[in-house]
């Protein structure tokens, strides 16, 4: 399971950070899923091996521009590049209305099947090698977090049970292991589900939109290997800014991840005021976000960088690529 950050800035881009967009890929195959689509996301894709033509679903967390202004351009480019495969768009109803207005007034044409699914707490959609669900968050507008659980986990065959029931090894074993039901020569049907189990635990990543109450993700994060969450500010700046923007600090997200025992945490969506290197005295640094989170979280901690990729290994480790 692979995570690639296409944009990691909040509100406005910087020289080194584009706006929110995160690609998620399964272990095998080229299909993938995109979470949010800030302005110029398609430009960022040109710097990666990811193909927009293999994109199967776009999950928008909320209508704010730094999370969805890149959507019309990406969809239009898919049309120009000859896309014919269906594409699923998930998000608040306002996202669909925004897209429809852009299509109307710019004469944007989309011929490939584009299915919109309004996000809600009952969301259960399969795309890009993942089973996707959602939970509502706390922000100035309707906002959601998404849980992506991998579905392409090989099955393990219960050979002992098959042999105990007198079913000899043969080509039928392979059918059952692929998840296919099997009819025996005597007419009996064997259900693959009765003779197989997952060979390992499916990996799970939770990617949240803007949110000032990390605890709202408790249900979605149950059993998760990775949480990707905004840390727009350090706690001191958040207190100065006040509650109105409804964002989180590194401290608040780190405390939540520690309480939930989430093994891997990647912080993203940093205010442009935080720089990688100081330009003048008094500049705030991204390193402060890391230091604050580390004081409250003992798991594996990373700060997202544009175009950086991370692998969640089969044993749940977060490895740089």
Question: Which residues are covered by each model-predicted region?
Answer:
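Active-site-proximal loop/helix segment associated with metal-binding centers of metalloenzymes
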Residues: 15-16, 130-207, 211-219, 226-228
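Active-site neighborhood of phospho(di)ester-bond hydrolases with catalytic His/Asp-centered motifs
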Residues: 35-38, 55-64, 92, 205-211, ...
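Binuclear metal-ion centers of metallo-dependent hydrolases, dominated by the metallo-beta-lactamase
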Residues: 121, 213-321
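Short, surface-exposed amphipathic charged segments that create phosphate/polyanion-binding patches used
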Residues: 125-135, 314-321
